[in-house]
Each structure stands twice: as structure tokens, then as C-alpha cells.
Amino acid sequence: LEQLVKKLGEATSASVVLTGVSFQEDKLGALTYDKDKNTISYFFTDRVPTMFHGTGDCFASAFFGAVVKGYSYQEAAKIACEFTYMAVKNTEPFQDKHWYGVYFESALSYLTNL
């Protein structure tokens, strides 16, 4: 993965964020490659044993919001992973009735308290 994101960064002249990274069955997270600093970072949360649509949108929104607010890519990935995890975890009890997205609103206070 590290070679892949570095090559992608070189090909696009941009930093790279890769989500859905997992090396352990019970963990899920993201990898960031900061092209300017030539650094690779990982951040993981517990994997919630279910799947919902819209988690990529939640991650991207939280990530870019954090970057705009001045956080580094590594810090933004951590924030986005934690926010997405909270949204999924809060939606898990309703998975039989709520399959089309996550209750991200329940995790917004995490972002507003940064």
C-alpha cells in the first residue's frame, strides 16, 4: 500500500488518502501520504461488524473540514476515522430499519468540539 500511494502521489503531484485499510480483522482505518513531507501515516478504529452506505461521504466531509480548519492530513484522517466510526456505531442498533446511510448527526458534537 505504501508504494501504491507514493506512486499515486508522484503521478498526481498530490497527497493521498486511502480509506478502508485493514491489517487486522477487527480494525479498519485510513492511510495518508503527505507528499510535501514525504510521510505515511495510519489511523485505525475498531471495525463495526456491519456495513452502511454513505460512510465515505462522512469520512470525506470530516476530513476536508478538518484540513480547511488547519489540521494536518494525518490529524484530519484521525478525526475523520473517529467521526465515521461514531456515526456507524450509533447507527448499528438500527441496522435492520436504517440501511441507506448512517446517523452522522449523532456524532456532529465530536466535530464541533475540536
Cite the ranges covered by each PLM segment.
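Charged C-terminal helix
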Residues: 74-114
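Conserved phosphate/ATP/ADP-binding segment of small-molecule kinases
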Residues: 1-40
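Phosphate-handling active-site elements
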Residues: 39-40, 66-80
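Glycine-rich beta-alpha junction loops
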Residues: 20-24, 46-49, 81-85
